[in-house]
């Protein structure tokens, strides 16, 4: 039986600081806690996990291109680049592998500048405002899609 390609979880700028960064917005879990949770969920569904974070837009674009070749699906929290990066939106549009956009906070309840996302239109789905639990929900959704 061919083994499934891993799920990629890609994180953008400042998410390396989770745990200490604005805990009233993002809670107390660190990125490493989130990675452990994602790995357990992915493995429970029979997937491997590739979990990455970058503060650099171009690196995230490169990883989305890689994902098109080597991933089953992508969970993407692009941080503030969500609201500014046409290049990331174009990268999501350019690849065939499904991308689930995740935000820890409810961006629609925050400043107006956070209401627009370059990623939402080309994304396969969006999970917003469920705290760090959103990453696991995205992995469960990907597993459900690919089972059916
Ligand atoms: C975020 C929301 C963005 O507006 C913000 O810039 C982030 C985190 C979230 O997960 O809630 O860095 O993507």
Please place each PLM-identified region on the residue numbering.
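A charged, well-structured terminal subsegment
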Residues: 128-148
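Short glycine-rich anion-binding loops that position phosphate/pyrophosphate groups of nucleotides
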Residues: 13-15, 79-82, 105-107
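Short beta->alpha junction loops
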Residues: 48-58
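Extreme N-terminal starter segment of soluble prokaryotic enzymes
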Residues: 3-7
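Short, acidic/small-residue loops that bind anionic groups at enzyme active sites
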Residues: 93-110
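Short acidic/histidine-rich motifs immediately flanking catalytic phosphotransfer sites
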Residues: 67-74
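Active-site-proximal loop->helix
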Residues: 88-91, 110-119
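Glycine- and acidic-residue-enriched helix-capping/strand-helix junction motifs
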Residues: 18-32
């Amino acid at each position: 039986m061919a083994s499934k390609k891993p799920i990629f979880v890609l994180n953008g700028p400042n998410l390396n600081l989770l745990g200490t960064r604005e805990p009233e917005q993002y809670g107390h879990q660190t990125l490493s806690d989130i990675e452990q949770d994602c790995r357990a969920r992915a493995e429970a569904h029979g997937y491997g996990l590739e979990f990455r974070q970058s503060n650099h837009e171009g690196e995230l674009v490169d990883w989305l291109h890689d994902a098109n070749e080597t991933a089953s699906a992508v969970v993407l929290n692009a941080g503030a680049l969500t609201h500014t990066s046409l290049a990331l939106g174009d990268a999501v549009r350019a690849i065939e592998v499904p991308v689930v956009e995740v935000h820890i906070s409810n961006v629609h309840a925050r400043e107006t500048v956070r209401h627009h996302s370059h990623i939402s239109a080309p994304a396969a789905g969006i999970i917003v405002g469920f705290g760090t639990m959103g990453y696991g929900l995205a992995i469960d959704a990907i597993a459900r899609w690919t089972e059916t």
